[in-house]
């Protein structure tokens, strides 16, 4: 018997980085089809209800969205399960707030508050550069955009800076040794560092060696790396901790120091 697409998602099967409590019900919101993969996105309902606390219930979220109060990348979105993903800009003009979705060092989405000027652009990783009919060049980005007539210097894995009002390329960052990157997949998700080395393996994955601000080195796959700035200066504001992953002992010491400071105060 033929079966169509599943329209539901069990809460225990939802991505861990959504941080849903087990006892909050049997089901979780299933992301709609969109620019990001279902396991690598955060539906709008979770942003409004669970993260920003602007709504208490599912119905309140629908009411807010239907009043066209929420914009993603400069466009009004009324779909409650629209999949917002890495680097997306969420704007709420009514409150004058803007947020950029980034990862913390534990691989969870963080809503990083940004200024109005920073909310006007977005960084996009280039997936491929191709030629269409009549030899027209175009590039594809990680979030499903297609942009025609890009600069010929731009290649796959580079990062482009897009003006969200005009949807045109303002600037770009080459994927080169010495540029700052953020890891978007694997066990090092959310870590920020500078590319030190690039290992090419024919017939296998390319390995990228990265060094963070404290001098710790780690390696990850090429597909997990997203260039976010030239040199060691990122073009976007980073979450608390600046993408530096602490060891378990370092985290404990940090908590103890904070508790001691609070006790003394």
From Swiss-Prot:
Molecular functions per Gene Ontology: RNA binding; rRNA binding; structural constituent of ribosome
Pfam family, one: 40S_S4_C
Signal sequence segment: none
Domain S4 RNA-binding: start-end pairs: 42-104
Keywords: Cytoplasm, Ribonucleoprotein, Ribosomal protein, RNA-binding, rRNA-binding
Record's GO cellular component terms: cytosolic small ribosomal subunit
Xref: InterPro entries: KOW, Rib_uL2_dom2, Ribosomal_eS4, Ribosomal_eS4_C, Ribosomal_eS4_central_region, Ribosomal_eS4_central_sf, Ribosomal_eS4_KOW, Ribosomal_eS4_N
GO biological process, one term: translation
Subcellular location: Cytoplasm
Keyword flag rRNA-binding: yes
Predominant location category: cytoplasm
PANTHER family in the cross-refs: 30S/40S RIBOSOMAL PROTEIN S4, SMALL RIBOSOMAL SUBUNIT PROTEIN ES4
UniProt family annotation: Belongs to the eukaryotic ribosomal protein eS4 family.
Protein name: Small ribosomal subunit protein eS4
Gene name, Swiss-Prot/TrEMBL: RPS4
């Amino acid at each position: 018997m033929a079966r169509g697409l599943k329209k539901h998602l069990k809460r225990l099967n939802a991505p861990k980085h959504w941080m849903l409590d087990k006892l909050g019900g049997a089901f979780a919101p299933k992301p709609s089809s969109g620019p990001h993969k279902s396991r690598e996105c955060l539906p709008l309902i979770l942003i409004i209800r669970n993260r920003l606390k602007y709504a208490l219930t599912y119905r309140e979220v629908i009411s807010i969205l239907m009043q066209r109060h929420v914009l993603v990348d400069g466009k009004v979105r009324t779909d409650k399960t629209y999949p917002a993903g890495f680097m997306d800009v969420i704007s709420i003009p009514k409150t004058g707030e803007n947020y950029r979705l980034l990862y913390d060092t534990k691989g969870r989405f963080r809503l990083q508050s940004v200024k109005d000027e920073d909310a006007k652009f977005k960084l996009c990783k280039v997936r491929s550069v191709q030629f269409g009919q009549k030899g027209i060049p175009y590039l594809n980005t990680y979030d499903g955009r297609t942009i025609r007539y890009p600069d010929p210097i731009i290649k796959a894995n580079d990062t482009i800076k897009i003006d969200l009002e005009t949807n045109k390329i303002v600037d770009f960052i080459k994927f080169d040794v010495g540029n700052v990157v953020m890891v978007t997949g694997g066990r090092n998700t959310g870590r920020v560092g500078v590319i030190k080395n690039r290992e090419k393996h024919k017939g296998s994955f390319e390995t990228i060696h990265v060094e963070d601000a404290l001098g710790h080195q780690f390696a990850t796959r090429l597909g997990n790396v997203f260039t976010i700035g030239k040199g060691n200066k990122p073009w976007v504001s980073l979450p608390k901790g600046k993408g530096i992953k602490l060891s378990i002992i370092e985290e404990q010491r940090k908590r103890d120091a904070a508790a001691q400071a609070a006790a003394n105060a």
